[in-house]
Amino acid sequence: MKITGLFKEFFESEKSSGLFLISCTLFSLVIANSAIANSYLHFWHANLAGNSLEYWINDGLMTIFFLLIGLELEREVYDGELSNIKDAMLPIFGAIGGMIVPAGLFLVMNFGTKTQSGAGIPMATDIAFALAILSLLGNKIPLSLKIFLTALAVIDDLGAILIIAVFYTKTLLWTNLCIALGIFGFLLILNRLKIRNLIPYLIGGVFMWYFMLHSGVHATITGVLLAFAIPFGNGDSRSTSYILQHFLHKPVAFFILPLFALANTAIVLSSNISETLIQNYSIGIALGLIIGKPLGIFLLSMLAVSLGICKLPDDLNWKSILAVGFLGGIGFTMSIFITLLAFNDDTIINNAKFVILISSLIAGIIGYFSLKYVLKNTIIENKN
């Protein structure tokens, strides 16, 4: 398996960010259920330029997160794990399985109800949290497993982006959408003309975000489009894409995602938690993340290898693929993000966030201990 120049930096920042995110989440949950809860909740909903602070984080700052995801995906396509179609097929099939099966389980529980729109919730993977859990196992983790999980999560996020664009766009203002796409086309022309200066791309990106925001399509899509408009060149440290990607790693990991977590995990816990957990949408989310994710990743990966479409890396086995599949069930920030688009009822949103947190925690614990067991046995077998 191939490793890109920025992969180690990406992995390090993501795992550190994941641990920081856990701290932010616990802090937010405690404060949201304390004596100062009202002030804390009011802070995130305070008016800022006509919208709440939470709104600007979700529709503004998260666009920068998706820009980084787009740049990572671009690098993987041109110069990384996804550049070789044979190598790319394993995480691609795993990601497809990890989206279809969770969505299917959710729909089994919710089809025909007002909450069926939440099928996209268990389809996403939180890269930062998943890599943070993986990093707790230290140097025991094969490099190919780190790359598999990272590629899987990036493809998952791409799937989530497509889902947001296709299924969570309620009303379209075609004029604004066409202007946004026109700006994207103009930036592609700049790319083809080999204009490497980052400034026109960033200015164009701001205007594209504005018109996308007012088109009905979720504005975060702008981040991914902008990423693929920015010149990749030969991908070395002087390329425009590399410079921006390198610059964004830490602000995204240690500012944007933690801020998103603080704003969106201010969950007021219900006094009747048992009633929350037996709702159809709650069961659907839990089944999707805890069972659907690992099962889908495992089955589709095995199918792809069985059909000769790709091969399993020499230092991996099916037990490790199943174990890492549970880490794919850590939906957290991405699942919460889709929840905000899928539902309008504040009670359902609050309950869904709680179930996402619990399900992600369970998936993470199962993934950690199953991987620890699998890797320990693999080391013993290799010694024998």
From Swiss-Prot:
Record-given protein name:
Na(+)/H(+) antiporter NhaA
Q: What lineage does the source organism belong to? A: Bacteria, Pseudomonadati, Bacteroidota, Flavobacteriia, Flavobacteriales
HAMAP family, per database record: NhaA
Q: Which UniProt keywords are listed?
A: Antiport, Cell inner membrane, Cell membrane, Ion transport, Membrane, Sodium, Sodium transport, Transmembrane, Transmembrane helix, Transport
Reaction catalysed? Na(+)(in) + 2 H(+)(out) = Na(+)(out) + 2 H(+)(in)
Family affiliation: Belongs to the NhaA Na(+)/H(+) (TC 2.A.33) antiporter family.
Can you supply a Gene Ontology BP term from the record? regulation of pH
Major location (coarse): membrane
Q: Which organism is it from?
A: Flavobacterium psychrophilum (strain ATCC 49511 / DSM 21280 / CIP 103535 / JIP02/86)
* Xref: NCBIfam families: NhaA (TIGR00773), PRK09560.1 (NF007111)
Give the highest taxon in the source lineage.
Answer: Bacteria
Role = Na(+)/H(+) antiporter that extrudes sodium in exchange for external protons.
Query: Tell me, what's a Pfam family for it?
Result: Na_H_antiport_1
Task: Specify whether Transport is a keyword of the entry.
Answer: yes
Q: How does it sit in the membrane?
A: Multi-pass membrane protein
| Residue intervals passing through the bilayer | 17-37, 53-73, 89-109, 118-138, 147-167, 171-191, 198-218, 251-271, 283-303, 321-341, 354-374
Nucleotide-binding listed as a keyword: no
Q: Where in the cell is it found?
A: Cell inner membrane
Q: Which InterPro entries match?
A: Na/H_antiporter_dom_sf, NhaA
State the coiled-coil residue ranges.
Answer: none
Question: In the record, what terms sit under GO molecular function?
Answer: sodium:proton antiporter activity
The gene that this protein is the product of is nhaA
List the GO terms this entry assigns under cellular component, sorted alphabetically: plasma membrane
